[in-house]
Amino acid sequence: MKKENMAMLCDFYEFTMSNGYFKNGFYKKNVYFDVFFRKVPDNGGFAIMAGLEQAIEYIRELHFEDEDIEYLKSKGIFDEQFLEYLRNFKFSGDVYAIPEGTPIFPNEPVMTIKAPAIEAQLVETFLLLTINHQTLIATKANRIVRAAQGRAVLEFGSRRAQGANAAVDGARAAYIGGCKGTACTLTDELYGVPAGGTMAHSWVQMFNSEYDAFKTYCEMYPDNPTLLVDTYNTLKSGVPNAINAVSYTH
């Protein structure tokens, strides 16, 4: 998966404030910015920290391309010396964070950025969107896993995710929250989250009978057949046909 430069994925006021810091001599001043949240959704007791790996990768790779500088220059409001500063930008600060998968609580810092003012300001948007999204997914997944009381829970969220990155990162976050695996193949390829799944209704409908569909699938994947039993009638045909197909092939 090709990595994109996310430097410009940033609220515009981060640039206008940073320009002001530069012109007023604040850009070398070290500051501390904390990432925290105020309330756990749905009256939950705690959240599950997630998104740290992507946040750190972003900080390490953060730089501005020539076209980014030209875009900012075209706005006509940024100091030339500030734009030159951005051209040579590299994060030099320190990051302190709670490890992924750790329970976290309202109003406590889950990440602290110690850096020169401009550096701390420019990373704000990406850090918040990354930690907020993945922590939300990990927290919800953890609640479901705990409610399942030891039964395996899988993540199948890609087709309803808000974009490709949300699908991949959301599956990773669900795994951090306790899910056993995901339907998202790319998340397995990139992060090693076990990919798996059942079958689609289209597979069952491709055959002359539900039993034939199950039997063929069991023959192809005898070690771990997972059958979808609700295409026609779950109790009258799906479950009986699944039992018969598994019994026949085993």
Spell out what each predicted region is.
Residues M1-Y32, K39-P41, I77, L83-S92, ...:
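Buried, small/hydrophobic-residue-enriched core segments of structured protein domains
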Residues Y32-R87:
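N-terminal, Lys/Arg-enriched amphipathic/low-complexity engagement segments
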